[in-house]
Design a protein with these regions (language model features):
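Glycan-association/targeting regions that enable binding to alpha-glucans and other polysaccharides
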Residues: 1-139, 143
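Carbohydrate-binding surface patches
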Residues: 38, 45-50, 611-651, 691, ...
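Conserved, mostly hydrophobic/aromatic
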Residues: 51, 145, 204, 214, ...
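C-terminal beta-strand-rich structural cap/linker in extracellular carbohydrate-active enzymes
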Residues: 55, 676-705
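Hydrophobic faces of well-ordered beta-strands that scaffold small-molecule active sites
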Residues: 141-143, 212-214, 293-295, 392, ...
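Substrate-binding/active-site clefts of carbohydrate-active enzymes
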Residues: 147-210, 217-386, 414, 420, ...
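Conserved alpha/beta catalytic core and glycan-binding cleft of carbohydrate-active enzymes
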Residues: 305-310, 379-380, 386, 411, ...
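Aromatic- and carboxylate-lined catalytic core of secreted/periplasmic carbohydrate-active enzymes
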Residues: 578-611
């Protein structure tokens, strides 16, 4: 026959273009609750899996899992679609599946890549029995706070100029809240603290925040605090100082054993206990308001000031503290670190540093069971009473240890320890690249979503690399690249991980998104601070916020983004929050989009389908069986007409369907003024303004008459 004699390439073109005989665009399934229930099954659960086709368009559909073929039953017909179902029972092991569709002589396949003429194992759907991500995280609106730059609620705990010596100079107290951070600003302190966070909880609640993610808060000599000095205590400089003294360093003195004021502040048990108590009170108040809080866990490395190392000899003669590993070969912490020269004590400087940084000693887990137990105790302590934090964000989590095998072993133990103490605590990892091997239900819950959110969004809308280090014309407005990147990287995230993934536009490691809208390559060191806000386009920022608030996952606002803060990458991205000088339009827009995100749960847990795209243009839908939200983006600098295939979200192809506009943003501002748009035969015709973003909504009862 004709089909049987075709070459493979011709068969592929034949299959993909033979509509209406076989409508590939109508085929759909995913891992959401609308196409797989339960979404996160346990061993022994019966799982119902669904598949959608065009009505009366296929002969049969088979669910293929682990080599077994199950013919699916047509469960129902709704509108223009048929829905097929099959059930499988979960065992202990991973289940992989895909769909095989037959129509006449044609056979095609459906997996996480969509329709294909050839089955590939690497793109099959996967279910890990027992994989569970806390429900409260899924779709939660998160807010990241870099504490020193957010709000100064207690000036009495401010770091003083000359209080101690760190990386080439003494600490600096910045008196001007609006001053731009210095290029080498790691030892600059603006005075933000936990009392300031407490004072602004009304603001965060009004904004619509569900979860507060705090950058590190433990004792540390830097403002970023990724160089931990004491994992058991909140830094009194952002907590409470109840015992103080004189004793700043003399000019030219770099010996921190003379830094008496600093030593008193960070080693006196009364200060440490008072600071922990303040943190406890903060968490209690956050919980009282119905919000959650996540801490930053920096467990790959610590700081050279750390009491286990004590390179600065801060703890050497303090009552109640053991000798640090730098100080003495007999230190109980010697095995916590790897020393290259065993003959250099006392004061041995030959320890391994993370990326060779001597201020960041690499923790030597494989050689110290005691270190492993200690860090596991830290993980348990802060999610347990009386602190009761709601989870951990794990810094450079894949770097921990010296081998992949140990890394996975440790995170399994960490998860077991944390979840036993607080089953609803979340474990969220910083990770670049494919996280799949950590996301199998026994290590991390989810990740900071760089690959499947931040990077594709910034390339598409701005053409900029996320540090503002590169501009690429070939990726600016390239919707095909955006869709390809999203589909590819989302395959690595199972539904629970995707629902809880931290979807950020900016953070403490990358340039502010608003700065990226000026398409300018630059850093503070050579471009200057003013260049970060020159030529910015707030309308593109609003487009990004629309995506952020309508994409599966947990939209995470980096403090100040909502207020219009600009900045190149670290340290310029750590400017202070501009209290009283916010970009009010940008702030109000964030509030309104957060309201939309929270009012329509399908934005957090619905199915996602791309509906239309071209250069500088994109549309996608979030939908269930009875509800649809369509997002349309025009990133061009001129108005244009756009035709969107709304029927792919499940609306009728035969009857007119009314969509209500929830939001329209453009270069002129934004409006929530209601307006009705009619999808005729499943097609929406929309005139989109320049740099426009539109959000449309339809429920089954809104059918146009």
């Amino acid at each position: 026959m004709l089909y049987e004699s075709m070459e493979t390439a011709k068969k592929m073109r034949y299959i993909l273009n033979m509509s209406p005989v076989l409508n590939k665009d109508a085929m759909f399934s995913d891992g959401t609750e609308y196409y797989r229930t339960p979404v996160e099954p346990r061993e022994g659960d019966t799982v119902t899996i669904r598949f959608r086709t065009q009505r009366n368009n296929v002969d049969n559909v088979c669910l293929v899992h682990d080599g077994e073929y199950l013919e699916m039953k047509r469960e129902k017909t709704s509108g223009s679609f048929d829905y097929y179902t099959a059930q499988i029972v979960m065992g202990k092991d991973l289940v992989r599946y895909y769909f095989e569709i037959h129509s006449g002589l044609v056979t095609c396949y459906y997996d996480t890549n969509g329709v294909s003429t050839r089955h590939e194992e690497r793109t099959e759907f996967e279910i890990y029995p027992g994989y569970h991500v806390p429900e409260w995280l899924k779709g939660a609106v998160m807010y990241q706070i870099y504490v020193d730059r957010f709000c100064n609620g207690d000036p009495s705990n401010d770091v003083e100029t000359g209080e101690y010596f760190y990386i080439g100079d003494t600490s600096v107290k910045v008196d001007n809240w609006e001053k731009v951070p210095a290029v080498m600003g790691v030892r600059e302190f603006y005075g933000g603290d936990l009392q300031g966070v407490m004072d602004k909880l009304d603001y965060l609640q009004e904004l619509g925040v569900d979860v507060i993610y705090l950058n590190p808060v433990f004792v540390s000599p830097s403002n970023h605090k990724y160089d931990c000095q004491d994992y058991d205590h909140i830094d009194p400089h952002i907590g409470r100082i109840v015992e103080d003294c004189d004793g700043l360093l003399s000019p030219g003195d770099s010996d921190n054993s003379h830094a008496l004021k600093y030593i008193r502040r960070v080693t006196d048990k009364r200060n440490l206990e008072a600071s922990n108590k303040l943190f406890q009170e903060l968490v209690e108040e956050i919980h009282r308001r119905g919000m959650k809080v996540i801490l930053d866990g920096v467990f790959n490395h610590c700081g050279s000031f750390n009491k286990w190392m004590d390179r600065e000899r801060i703890y050497e003669n303090q009552e109640g503290y053991e000798k640090g590993a730098y100080v003495s070969a007999d230190s109980p912490y010697r095995s916590f670190f790897c020393f290259q020269d065993q003959n250099r004590w006392p004061y041995n400087p030959t320890y391994d540093g993370w990326w060779t940084h001597d201020t960041l000693p690499k923790l030597n887990y494989e050689e110290s069971e005691e270190l492993c137990r200690t860090i596991l105790d830290v993980g348990r302590k802060w999610v347990s009473p009386p602190y009761n934090v709601d989870g951990w964000r794990l810094d450079v989590a894949a770097d921990l240890g010296h081998s992949n095998d140990f890394n996975h072993h440790f995170w399994k133990e960490f998860r077991r320890t944390v979840k036993e103490a607080n089953p609803e605590a979340v474990i969220l990892a910083e990770h670049y690249g494919n996280p799949e091997s950590w996301l199998r239900g026994d290590e991390w819950d989810t990740v900071m979503n760089y690959d499947a959110f931040m990077e594709p969004v910034t390339w598409f809308l701005t053409g900029m690399e996320k540090h503002s280090d590169e501009y690429r014309e070939d990726l600016y407005g390239n919707s095909e690249a955006f869709i390809g990147a999203m589909k590819h990287h989302m395959q690595s995230l199972h539904m629970g991980a995707l629902y809880g993934a931290m979807n950020e536009l900016s953070n403490h490691d990358h340039s502010r998104f608003l700065t990226r809208t000026n398409h300018r390559v630059g850093r503070l060191s050579y471009a200057g601070a003013e260049a970060a806000s020159a030529g910015i386009n707030p309308a593109i920022m609003r487009e990004a916020v629309v995506i952020q608030m309508t994409w599966p996952g947990s939209p995470t606002v980096y403090y100040g983004d909502e207020a219009g803060v600009c900045g190149f990458t670290d340290p310029d991205n750590r400017r202070t929050y501009p209290w009283g000088k916010e970009d009010q339009e940008m702030l109000d827009f964030h509030k309104r989009m957060i309201c939309i995100h929270k009012a329509y749960p399908i934005l957090a847990k619905g199915s996602l389908e791309f509906l239309w795209n071209d250069h500088q243009g994109l549309s996608y839908g979030c939908f269930s069986d009875s509800e649809q939200i369509i997002v349309i983006l025009n990133n061009q600098d001129q108005e244009r007409d756009i035709r969107v295939t709304a029927w792919k979200t499940g609306v009728s192809r035969k009857e007119a369907t009314a969509f209500q506009r929830l939001m329209l943003s453009s270069g002129e501002g934004y409006t929530e003024m209601p307006e009705e748009y009619i999808a005729d035969a499943g097609i929406l015709q929309v005139k989109m303004p320049a740099y426009g973003a539109m959000v449309l909504h339809h429920r089954a009862r809104d059918k146009y008459k």
